[in-house]
């Protein structure tokens, strides 16, 4: 990882923090960048895989509480976030409802009156929680 990557990620972090309605921004460095490559998604058993059915039945699975206290660029990826990233990758495998941001990808998940926005590339995950207005 070079300093430019960290600087651009931090710039992104600072810019989205000031958007109205944003209730949390969480920046994570991915130590195992391979986890974000669809061909390298680890095989998981049913207990650790989060399905769309689960999300529909329990729309609070991915609330900001999942990510609180985990912010920073120097932490290992928490197990819960790994599950979330894998879940996002699984969605991307089954549909094309994401926006191409150059080398990054964007996915929005909406639940209740809140949105969880996941942006990721090979080095970072930025998770943003935003109240819908």
From Swiss-Prot:
The keyword Nucleus applies. It is found in: Cytoplasm; Nucleus. It comes from the Eukaryota. Coiled coil: none annotated. GO terms for cellular component: cytosol; nucleus. Its main location: cytoplasm. GO terms for biological process: meiotic cell cycle. The keyword Nucleus applies. Has a role in meiosis. This is Meiotically up-regulated gene 15 protein. It comes from Schizosaccharomyces pombe (strain 972 / ATCC 24843) (Fission yeast).
């Amino acid at each position: 990882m070079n300093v430019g990557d960290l600087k651009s990620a931090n710039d992104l972090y600072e810019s989205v923090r000031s958007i109205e309605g944003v209730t949390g921004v969480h920046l994570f460095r991915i130590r195992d960048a391979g986890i974000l490559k669809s061909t390298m998604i680890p095989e998981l058993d049913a207990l650790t895989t989060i399905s769309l059915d689960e999300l529909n039945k329990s729309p609070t699975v991915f609330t900001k509480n999942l990510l609180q206290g985990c912010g920073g660029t120097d932490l290992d990826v928490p197990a819960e976030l790994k599950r979330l990233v894998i879940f996002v990758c699984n969605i991307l495998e089954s549909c094309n409802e994401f926006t191409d941001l150059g080398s990054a990808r964007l996915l929005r998940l909406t639940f209740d009156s809140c949105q969880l926005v996941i942006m990721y590339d090979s080095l970072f995950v930025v998770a943003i929680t935003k109240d819908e207005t």
